[in-house]
Amino acid sequence: MEETFVPFEGIKNDLKGRLMCYKQDWTGGFKAGFRILAPTTYIFFASAIPVISFGEQLERSTDGVLTAVQTLASTAICGMIHSIIGGQPLLILGVAEPTVIMYTFMFNFAKARPELGRDLFLAWSGWVCVWTALMLFVLAICGACSIINRFTRVAGELFGLLIAMLFMQQAIKGLVDEFRIPERENQKLKEFLPSWRFANGMFALVLSFGLLLTGLRSRKARSWRYGTGWLRSLIADYGVPLMVLVWTGVSYIPAGDVPKGIPRRLFSPNPWSPGAYGNWTVVKEMLDVPIVYIIGAFIPASMIAVLYYFDHSVASQLAQQKEFNLRKPSSYHYDLLLLGFLTLMCGLLGVPPSNGVIPQSPMHTKSLATLKYQLLRNRLVATARRSIKTNASLGQLYDNMQEAYHHMQTPLVYQQPQGLKELKESTIQATTFTGNLNAPVDETLFDIEKEIDDLLPVEVKEQRVSNLLQSTMVGGCVAAMPILKMIPTSVLWGYFAFMAIESLPGNQFWERILLLFTAPSRRFKVLEDYHATFVETVPFKTIAMFTLFQTTYLLICFGLTWIPIAGVMFPLMIMFLIPVRQYLLPRFFKGAHLQDLDAAEYEEAPALPFNLAAETEIGSTTSYPGDLEILDEVMTRSRGEFRHTSSPKVTSSSSTPVNNRSLSQVFSPRVSGIRLGQMSPRVVGNSPKPASCGRSPLNQSSSN
């Protein structure tokens, strides 16, 4: 993204670029037909369950002022508006954990002030949203998104681990509360007797750990040996919501003399019940807030503005990674401006604001990449079969596929249809294997399934329909509140723990923490699997010092969230990492080491073959995963980043790609080869090339 700080320049460029493809955003989605429902349903479950969980967390933290009704309504309204008039339709909006934390701090502050109290909390938070919106307007107009790249991996991964800790904290706190008598409840009820409280707590542990373990297991279903491919894909994509249903069903097993309140379930008023819509008229009470608190609302608003600026922009950035080969322009500045209007609207409606969320945004793009792959593959396979039936030559077959590929694209007038060029280059490479390009072709010469898989690049079905549909479905959950209230709260605590653990793989900060606790005699095992490149290029002592710095900073941020009033300042600590990384860390670490430890992209090295004989034997019988499994493996689960496979030079901090560099300039990443660090599987072999077996700093430190 080009840096521009001329007022309104970034917004103007974003609007100009997105308006040119606005019509195509809709027609492309409708042309996909019913196939668009698969990514829509996938991202709906990924959005709805966390929002329901955050609603239960807010209900407890705000004494019932805010519930799942408000979090679902905010997510639905903001999502629908963004999908219609937003810049980047791949970006998913929703109420996020940082917003819940900030609103918890604000409620505790208001509750402790007689001038505000519980009754004026929403009115005061409305003023906070007004100030937040004004600051977001200023940031968008001045082009602040131009410097989002200065938030390096240090800040992003530390923030991610902080959120994981807060998720786990909420899960533990919720489970402990299952053994206690809830506030605002009649303590004389049978279910609150000591014996029944203990029974409720133990049953809550069963439900929570049941969801956690089965949810984690289902995420790896695509690599299972059992079941058909479609069944494994179904479990991998929808296993977590299915497990929520399963364990909710298990919660209804107790019967007979068991009190009705065991286990405890989600509490929220129905949206049509008397008093449930009091939030929507909060704007009438905003003038009742004392002037000193209206001015004072600027302090938490500045923290929320910083938080949204960072979180929203990074979510949009991860949804538009270059490996997705997106054809349409970005819209960082305009989307931040729109977020300001959405925040203002939410404040006036008395609901918590929504912003871009991680990892749902890159998950949305990934699901649409799978859809585009399926659509392209079906069209090209049908074209190839028709060409073979008419005894076409190899050259004619590729010409026909080029034409079919061209019809599948609706490129903008100012963009080049890169797919046509790549098919042409693939054809040239194919002649080295097949001989005469004009020779007759049949299925023994041209393996339709394999050859077309090799030709297809990673592309995304960029459109607005899936985002609009999933937001509408989230809104439908508000009407389904009587059904949602059947979910046990302990299942939601298990889901919080699931989100915490699920966010750790792919976080290099977490991987370094694990490395510090690995016995020196066992560190070589890290090298036997795909691993971060810094493991081979940076001395272990430097890795340890850098990790200790990050851990200390993380604990300071986490400790800050425990301080009643000062806790609202934790986003400022994340922003402070920019000057710390730019000016302070270079004084203590070598630039080359910092470049590897704080790489802009997620880079990893292939496994080092410590047992070459065993590797050869295994490699001769290895079968390769399907494309959907590859897309799961190629992206980190914590932030939805693409993994970049490279073979680092032990003597240098720089890395050289495993594949031929000249090929990387011709071919875009393929679905069937990107995980293996290849650019074109039809030119390069389908197995990763082993890295040099030189001694890495990790080996040297562990051999002592």
UniProtKB/Swiss-Prot annotation:
> Where is it expressed, tissue-wise?
Expressed in proximal side of various root cells, notably in the columella, lateral root cap, epidermis and endodermis in tip and elongation zones of the root. Also detected in the epidermis, cortex, endodermis, and stele cells of the root hair zone. Observed in cotyledons and hypocotyls.
**Cited function:** Efflux-type boron (B) transporter for xylem loading, responsive of boron translocation from roots to shoots under boron limitation. Boron is essential for maintaining the integrity of plants cell walls.
Q: Which protein family is it in?
A: Belongs to the anion exchanger (TC 2.A.31.3) family.
- Protein name as annotated: Boron transporter 1
This chain's source organism reads Arabidopsis thaliana (Mouse-ear cress)
Q: Which Pfam families match?
A: HCO3_cotransp
Q: Where in the cell is it found?
A: Cell membrane; Endosome membrane; Vacuole membrane
Query: Gene name?
Result: BOR1
TM helices/strands, residue ranges:
36-56, 76-96, 121-141, 156-176, 196-216, 234-254, 290-310, 338-358, 481-501, 558-578
Look up keyword DNA damage and say if it applies.
no
Which keywords does this Swiss-Prot/TrEMBL entry list? Anion exchange, Cell membrane, Endosome, Ion transport, Membrane, Transmembrane, Transmembrane helix, Transport, Vacuole
Under the GO molecular function aspect, what terms does this record hold?
active borate transmembrane transporter activity; solute:inorganic anion antiporter activity
Q: Name one GO cellular component term.
A: plasma membrane
Q: Show the taxonomic lineage.
A: Eukaryota, Viridiplantae, Streptophyta, Embryophyta, Tracheophyta
Q: Does the keyword Iron apply?
A: no
Q: Where is this region: Disordered?
A: 641-704
Which residues does the entry place in the Extracellular compartment? Answer: 57-75, 142-155, 217-233, 311-337, 502-557
